[in-house]
Amino acid sequence: TNALSMTDTIDLTSISSPISYKKSIPGQTQTIACPVRLPGYVRGIFFSRDSRPVDFEWPNNTNRLLPWVFNDLKELTDTRYPGIPSNATPSTLGDALLLELTNGEYLFAKAVAGRNSLSWLQVNDNGSVTLYVSTLGKDYLKPEVPLLLIRQGKDIYSTIRQAYQALMKNTEAADLKSRTAKEYFEAFRYLGWCTWEHYHDDINESKVINDMKTIEASGIPIRYVLIDDGHLAHKNRQLTGFIPDKQRFPSGWKKIMSYKKENKIKWIGLWYSLSGYWMGLSPENGFPQVVRQALYPHAGSLLPGTDSTRIRSFYRYYISTLKEQGFDFLKVDNQAFTLPLYMGGHESIRQATDCNRSLEAEIHRQNMGLMNCMAQNVINTDHTSYSNSTRVSIDYKKYDEDMAKSHLFQSYTNTLLLGQTVWPDHDMFHSCDTVCGTLMARSKAISGGPVYLSDAPGDFIKENIFPLIDEQGKLFRPEAPAVPMPESILTNPLWSGKAYRVAAPSGNGAMTLICYNLNASPRHQQVQATIKKEDYSLRNSFEKMSATPEERVLLYNWESQKAEEL
């Protein structure tokens, strides 16, 4: 990066404001680099994607924002760093840092967006940190831009929560509401089914209809179906229109919509990309002329823009077209790649942000549901003004135990951050997965987010499904999403040699807790976990809840169906 090096240090040993600003940036500057002074720390987590040579890098975080645990930051650039199984090495460019300090307190720092600027953190070989801020395009930075969201405190949960509360108040850096202040789309309160992990993109009209019939006859009260990738009309991975591929879906969506029933499959959702398809919109498209006027060519693709009004008009057409075809909600994927599609042009960050803002506004205005996916860069995460569900992890894969363990570690840790503003989506799973099925079912149960199967409908295993739902398919959900217990937050449970404990506050003043052995090493095939009476007091730390001191605490083991007093 051709960045202007700034001499003044961003001093995190002395915090005066929850969002720090850089002032007096010289004119005609596109990118600045600021050294960061860290307080003394014991250990921490750096949140960044993995660095895969064949893949795009930051800011295309996709679903790959991962928690890289360290005792010293320079470990992350060491080739011997153990990492996270099923993932590549840590990217040194990231979005957040969580530290346990030598004084016993905690420090949380997160990159932020401005009107047309974006910051990110870089870990250097010697363990030092540099903060960059850029327009990522041809424009120059304004004289004053936001740098970092920062919070320090004695309790790890409240430190992160208070940081996000400050972010929600800053309308320049974010357009956010807390998870508890937003509506949760009704369909996501029920069990669903998705085409992706069963078919990937090999879907067509007859397969979907046959599976809907099989689902209805299965005795499993699945209440929504999500049709994932494989239906889109496109050329070279660029969208040509919002009508499905005519060879695969000759009837459009009419036949499929006719299978909706109030007491069976009530809702149907559809997958699309934020920018149309993986590589944007095709110049050879069938959009109405008024929609074409809202698009412009950039770097081989058509994109919505350049002003906010045109971008909003494109998303108004996008959402209304799919709503008119009968869909109740959308899974909008590939969100993190929208910014790279705009990069190198004018007002790249502002336009990419407008895409997220417009999507949110139109989904809300037209009363549709929204699942956010591959939406883990700052622009995506910090502009969920209405939607209340975002994927927090890399895809689940059938029969892959290492990937399942990594998936759980990432999901629970990322929920500490993303769970402040949305319910976490732990991805779909196969109930028939003989390796990971029960593992996945339990994590979905305490995530509080959407729960959707992806088995072939004839392969459902009821033992991994019925404990999650009532007779109408309504999910039993906790009062807040599950997060790691304090001793499990700043450790890598795949190498720690210890148990990994997560918990969520649940109904009637209860707390639901899972003790995992996620260790990848055969040396730790068995670990011991302890549950103490004092653990119950943490129920009020996960959310800002009123204290409920209890003289007696009862522990109920769901597996054995037995209870004992702690």
Write out the residue ranges for each language-model feature.
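N-terminal accessory beta-strand-rich subdomains and adjacent acidic, glycine-rich linkers
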Residues: T1-K169
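Solvent-exposed beta-strand/loop surfaces of large extracellular or lumenal domains
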Residues: E550-L566
